[in-house]
Curated annotation (Swiss-Prot):
This is 3,4-dihydroxy-2-butanone 4-phosphate synthase. Its cofactor is Mg(2+); Mn(2+). InterPro entries: DHBP_synth_RibB-like_a/b_dom, DHBP_synthase_RibB. It holds the Pfam family DHBP_synthase. It comes from Yersinia pestis.
């Protein structure tokens, strides 16, 4: 990743700490992956703290595919099968079947309905019957070990939410440009500045977690 583009957001460690602080205070962050990977920026929120206004922003400026990033333990609690038995996608993105809250929604597609679905799915006592399948929210199963085992936006979302003191669940959506094309680093950074969101890269987060692990050992 071009560090010059990111210089306004601090050093790699500062970027991670500012992202954690933003989530802790109920704000969203922009997460960039490597230029050699998807080279995309995702809007990321802690699922537990996401607001209706943030969901509306996500739908308005994103791809429309709003994803709930969860652990495999949560996936099993909700009895959500994987979307396919053989994942042939390039980066092994682990979609489960899509979901909708069984109660409290209309068509399921509005910002309020999607937020209701997410809140139902992450509730401590959530059970399979709380959700209908299919729906308009796309759960993603994170890999155990987070970004240290897979350098994906899914794992970064869960890791960041956890570091901020929330349940291990994040909401993400890819940022798109006005013409419908995918936003890359320059557009992501411009969007982040406009909406007062920190920017962090997955490599930043991985290095931060590796450093913490070394200090703890």
């Amino acid at each position: 990743m071009n560090q010059t583009l990111l210089s306004d957001f601090g050093t790699p460690v500062e970027r991670v700490e500012r992202a954690i602080d933003a989530l802790r205070n109920g704000r969203g962050v922009m997460v960039l992956d490597d230029e050699s990977r998807e080279n995309e920026g995702d809007m990321v929120f802690a699922a537990e703290a996401m607001t209706l206004e943030q969901m509306a922003l996500t739908i308005r400026h994103g791809s429309g595919i709003v994803c709930l990033c969860i652990t495999d333990e949560r996936r099993q609690q909700l009895d959500l099968p994987m979307m396919v038995t053989h994942n042939s996608s390039q980066f092994q993105t682990a979609f489960t079947v899509t979901i909708e809250a069984a109660e409290g929604v209309t068509t399921g597609v509005s910002a309020a309905d999607r937020l209701t679905t997410i809140r139902k799915a992450i509730a401590d006592n959530a059970k399979p019957a709380d959700l209908n399948r299919p729906g308009h929210v796309f759960p993603l199963r994170g890999q155990p070990g987070g970004v240290l085992s897979r350098r994906g936006h899914t794992e970064a979302s869960i890791d960041l939410a956890t570091l901020a003191g929330y349940k291990p669940a994040g909401v993400l959506c890819e940022l798109t440009n006005d013409d419908g094309s995918m936003a890359h680093a320059p557009e992501v950074i411009a969007f982040a500045k406009l909406h007062d969101m920190p920017v962090v890269t997955i490599d930043d987060l991985a290095a931060y977690l590796q450093s913490r692990a070394k200090k703890a050992s």
